[in-house]
Amino acid sequence: MKNEGLLCDSYKRKIRKYNSYKGTCGKVASNRLRRRFTTDRPYQKIVTDVTELRWENKTTSERAYFTAFMDLYNGELISWNIGFHPNVDFIVSPLNKLMGLRPKTSYRMTIHSDQGFQYQNGRYINILKSNKVFQSMSRIATCLDNACIESFFNQLKVGTVHNNNFKDYNSINQAVKEYISYYNNYRIKQKLGGMSPVEYRIHSSQKIA
């Protein structure tokens, strides 16, 4: 995993890492992804998670939560959310956006997450079922099972909160928006042939057409 640049963020955290795991409070899915992080099909393998962002003095009153759905086809952040409460609504909102953006394909989508309470919730599961999406979950306390999204969270924090002294939520919210736009549209990746995620998606669709 280290050679692929996929690292967990827990090893460098000075404050306690956010953990959405509350035990078995709903339905736990098997690990369908099994660390197979590559695909040549867009919208086939999606990974998601929640992380915490803090500013100023980094107290519990100076924190927000961020979640994203990443397509492993090109590493693009398809949908995301930032807010103060990492509840089920917080997760369902970008999930519904993802479903709305999803093109018609001949294959089924798999969405992989950890075992956080939001992903065990019936509302989340029902959205997946109604859209014929496979659910996949990491094993407990095994961040490498979801290494791609963990790695992105590290990059996001280095590009925002770790190197800036934000004074309030609005400042960090704007910084996150700008970073995601940069990451999707301009940050080139060697494995994408020196293209950004969006460039790769457009280039690939033009080749197929």
Regions found by a protein language model. Give the residues of each.
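RNase H-like two-metal-ion nuclease catalytic core shared by retroviral integrases
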Residues: 20, 113-115, 121-122, 137-157, ...
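Short, surface-exposed connector motifs at secondary-structure boundaries
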Residues: 76, 104-109
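An active-site-proximal beta-strand-loop segment
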Residues: 35-78
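Mobile genetic element proteins and their domesticated derivatives, centered on retroelements
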Residues: 1, 33, 49, 75, ...
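Short small-residue beta-strand/loop micro-motif enriched in glycine and branched aliphatics
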Residues: 74-80, 135-138, 162-163
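C-terminal domain-tail junction helix/linker
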Residues: 129-133, 155-209
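Active-site beta-loop-alpha junctions of metal-dependent nucleic acid enzymes
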Residues: 62, 81-105
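Basic, flexible linker segments flanking DNA-binding modules
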Residues: 1-41, 198-205
